[in-house]
UniProtKB/Swiss-Prot annotation:
GO terms for molecular function: 2-hydroxyglutarate dehydrogenase activity; L-malate dehydrogenase (quinone) activity. Its EC number is 1.1.5.4. Its cofactor is FAD. It holds the Pfam family Mqo. The keyword Acetylation does not apply. SUPFAM superfamilies: FAD/NAD(P)-binding domain. This is Probable malate:quinone oxidoreductase 1.
């Protein structure tokens, strides 16, 4: 049975952190807008935003070495690191505003202070990290970062990583107490709870079948109720596709020119999770290493303290897996169905160019549990097999697109696609993703609500005081804002 519903102002597809953030921003900036949300699963934040489906790192380049690039002359380019840190500052300011205004309570349910650290082995890598820290510390955003090669100091930070270490190779660690662990699933659920209280229609177990533009300029979105099997068509002035790995297939259904010559490559993640509480309680940090030469950015190994429902956990990974699914709950046909006449050359070109990625994935798929444990022992020399179990994390779909220079380029990062008229936006890609959700959604609003955005700026600056500024260039403003953020989020 198919029914036609009346028009709405905004449709958000996907019940993750991106839709939750965009919906919250719109209700703050334009409360009269009628918003509907459609999610395929039974509750919000259960795919990419789920606490076990991502690393929970508040990505701010305090520990992620792949956000800084080393030149042939030994200089380190920190521009990407500064940008990502600035984006995370925006997220923290918005969350602090929501706590301050009573829309989020008990911030420790979704954010915890956890030191962020980098770890390297070998003379060349030690030289790199020294140069990296020296360059980063020129910015106020990284003023609290410490570097050490002193065994006792390093042991005081991460005893498990120093005890039992026998190699003569030099090691170095950085330490920044301002790092965080974020439960994006808990945050997403709370944001949607607030939106429901503000009149937003959030419907679960809803599968979006089609998205088509009308001559009037509005969009028709066909949705199937997975419980009743009824199909309903909704009309909306604006559509946002924030459905994780399912965003690409949904974008392709729109037929907009920006959906052409773009593809996706799914990668799944495996982690080792510690089952020994005594071990878990002796490590309190997110420690990121350096990816092997030739390995993709997604392969950066890290030993992570996590907080889930108030309980501390310890994970190590990721190890790449392969599944043709675009979502953890998706179909094995997702990858095949995403190949279209307009992107087949794009996909094939990427396959030819990215042989190193293919080799990496094959090598990861061949790993035994003992080999995974050997990788862990690079970080934690005394790790015991019996204390760790393998868990499967979420699916990520890496974007493949044509650029002006060449076809089939694999993109690492998060990408916003918008129609020419700004009536539709889609979010594709992976890390840093959720950490930068607020800044990304500001980008969506600027591109899709061009006429209204200028009038919204005073309210935006109330919610995010640094909006329009680069905090790295305004030390006093950073300290003033950070004091407020620390007060409300209860982090450092």
């Amino acid at each position: 049975m198919t029914t036609q519903h009346s028009k709405t102002d905004v449709i958000l597809i996907g019940g993750g952190i991106m839709s939750a953030t965009l919906g919250t921003l719109l209700k703050e900036l334009s409360p009269e807008k009628n918003i509907k949300v459609f999610e395929k699963l039974a509750q919000p934040g259960e795919e990419s935003s789920n606490v076990w489906n991502n690393a929970g790192t508040g990505h701010s380049a305090l520990c992620e070495l792949n956000y800084t690039k080393e030149g042939k002359d030994g200089t380190v380019d920190c521009s990407k690191a500064i940008k990502i840190n600035e984006q995370y500052q925006i997220s923290k300011q918005f969350w602090a505003y929501l706590v301050k205004t009573g829309q989020l309570d008990n911030p420790d349910r979704f954010i915890q202070a956890v030191p962020h650290m980098s770890f390297v082995i070998g003379e060349d890598n030690v030289a790199f990290i020294k140069s990296r820290v020296a360059t980063l510390k020129k910015s106020v955003l990284f003023e609290k970062m410490k570097l050490s090669q002193d065994e006792e100091e390093m042991k005081s930070w991460v005893p498990l990583m120093i005890e039992g270490r026998k190699s003569d190779e030099p090691i170095a660690l950085t330490y920044d107490e301002t790092g965080t662990d974020v439960n994006f699933g808990a945050l997403t659920a709370k944001l949607f709870e607030n939106l429901e209280q503000r009149g937003v229609g959030i419907q679960y177990k809803q599968n979006v079948l089609d998205i088509k533009k009308q001559k009037s300029g509005a969009w028709l979105v066909k949705v199937k109720d997975l419980e009743t099997n009824e199909t309903t068509t909704y009309e909306s002035d604006f559509v946002f596709i924030g459905a994780g790995g399912a965003s690409l297939p949904l974008l392709q259904k729109t037929g907009i020119k920006q959906s052409k010559h773009i593809g996706g490559f799914p990668v799944s993640g495996l982690f080792l999770r510690c089952t020994n509480q005594e071990v878990i309680d002796r490590h309190h940090a997110k420690v990121y290493g350096k990816a092997a030469v030739g390995a993709p950015p997604m392969s950066v190994p890290h030993l992570d303290t996590r907080f889930v429902d108030g309980k501390r956990s310890l994970l190590f990974g990721p190890f790449a897996g392969f599944s043709p699914k675009f979502l953890k709950t998706g179909s094995h046909m997702d990858l095949i169905k995403s190949v279209k006449p307009n992107n087949i050359v794009t996909m094939l070109s990427a396959g030819i160019k990215e042989m190193s990625l293919t080799k990496y994935l094959v090598s990861q798929l061949m790993l035994s549990n003992d080999e995974r444990m050997d990788d862990l022992r690079v970080f934690f020399p005394n790790a015991k097999n019996e204390d760790w179990e393998v868990i499967t994390a979420g699916q990520r779909v890496q974007v493949i697109k044509d650029t002006e220079d060449s076809k089939g380029n694999l993109q690492f990062g998060t990408e916003v696609i918008t129609s020419d008229d700004g009536t539709l936006a889609a979010l594709l890609g992976a890390s840093p993703g959720a950490s930068t959700a607020v800044d990304i959604m500001f980008d969506v609003l600027q591109r899709c609500y061009r006429d209204e955005f200028k009038g919204w700026e005073p309210k935006i600056k109330e919610m995010v005081p640094s909006f329009g500024y680069r905090l790295t260039d305004h030390e006093d403003l950073y300290h003033k804002i950070n004091e407020e953020v620390t007060k409300y989020l209860q982090v450092k």
